[in-house]
Amino acid sequence: MIQSMYPIQKVSRSEFVPIRQLNYHVRQWGTPDKNIPPLVMVHGWMDVSASFQFVVDAMTQDRWIIAPDWRGFGLTDTPNQDNYWFPDYLADLDFLLDHYVGDRSIHLLGHSMGGHVATLYAGVRPERVDKLINLEGFGMAATRPAQAAGRYAKWIDELKTMHKGELDLKPYADLEGV
């Protein structure tokens, strides 16, 4: 058994929920309270719901918190495709909210990519989001249409290199170089 160096203060509950042909892993803290909107926390790219443990432990108010692992991350199934589309994240979130909260409004917190998804979702379903917290979710990088062909060509080349097993990660001399 792996022992954590961090002393967890509020233990989460884990469960799996069928969402859009995937077995979604969802972590929860606290108990549902009809007087307090649930807090839904969505993580960023290459992250997991357990990363919110530090935030949950720092909260002084006991409340119901729902944090899924996005498709392909953590313990949630990986779809049978090699890409992830933002509309899928929006739909997954909508189905998860149907399952857990029905027509109740929520407080929605997203970090990084999750912040971008949360902001998009609040725009698509404003009636479901009572409060929005966006942590470092700056959105997609700004590019010009004229850059598209070159960016796609580079992406295809990198994809082929990866599939051949020849992808080398770029080394950095120090933190400044990153």
Listing of model-derived features with the role each one plays in the protein:
Residues 1-39, 60-64, 101-104, 139-140, ...:
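Alpha/beta-hydrolase fold catalytic core
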Residues 25-78:
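Conserved HGGG/HGGXW glycine-rich cap/lid loop of the alpha/beta-hydrolase fold
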Residues 72, 114, 131:
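Conserved G/P- and acidic residue-centered "switch" motifs that form tight phosphate/ATP-binding loops
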Residues 56, 97, 121-122:
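A conserved amphipathic alpha-helix that caps or lines the catalytic cleft of carbohydrate-
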Residues 103, 128-129:
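Core-facing hydrophobic residues within beta-strands of well-ordered domains
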Residues 19-22, 27, 33, 67-109, ...:
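Active-site loop/oxyanion-hole signature of alpha/beta-hydrolase fold enzymes
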Residues 120-123, 130-174:
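Flexible "cap/lid" loop of the alpha/beta hydrolase fold
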Residues 110, 114, 118:
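Gly/Ala-rich beta-loop-alpha elbow adjacent to hydrolase catalytic centers
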